[in-house]
Regions:
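Nucleotide-activated sugar donor-binding and catalytic core shared by glycosyltransferases
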Residues: 1-164
Length: 164
């Protein structure tokens, strides 16, 4: 087996109650950060339902999975922050909200697609055991982020120039 922890970060704080209900139905130990209690060392799942901590919490991640990217969900959340801090990215095929970004990250080697839950599980297990692959994906993510930094300003400049 592998020694791992899961950090759940709901995009919307109001989802915390739904997530807590689901956590209570499964056997793993979990902790809710907003309860302001010390996190037990043996906790398996951390529910990050607090504000302003995402950047600090994700600094220690070895892998990131992009939410809302596997069936039955569609759209996907942003993988940009994970790439910027060098976290290897896994995502489902339903990245319609970030289609070009997702494709570019996969092409750069910073991310991998998982077509379903079984493939996601296999990729997580493979990458958990392969520090060289994680390191390569991490560097690819940081490189991708650096290469794309300032792209909004460049696009805006191009649009404004075309309007003149």
């Amino acid at each position: 087996g592998i020694d791992c922890r899961l950090l759940l970060v709901p995009r919307h704080a109001e989802r915390a109650l739904e997530i807590i209900r689901l956590l209570k139905q499964q056997p793993l130990t979990w902790h809710q950060r907003s309860q302001n209690t010390a996190t037990p060392n043996s906790v398996s799942i951390q529910l990050a339902d607090t504000t302003g901590e995402l950047a600090r919490l994700t600094q220690v991640a070895d892998l990131a999975f992009v939410g809302k990217s596997l069936e039955p969900n569609i759209g996907g959340q942003t993988p940009i922050e994970a790439a910027g801090i060098g976290i290897p990215i896994l995502m489902g095929p339903n990245m319609t909200n970030f289609k070009a970004v997702a494709k570019s990250l996969v092409h750069s080697g910073a991310a991998l697609y998982a077509n379903d839950e079984n493939q996601l599980k296999a990729l997580v297990l493979d990458l958990a055991k392969d520090s060289k692959a994680r390191a390569a994906m991490s560097q690819a993510g940081r490189d991708w982020h650096a290469d794309n930094k300032g792209s909004s300003a460049r696009i805006a400049h191009t649009i404004l120039a075309a309007l003149d």
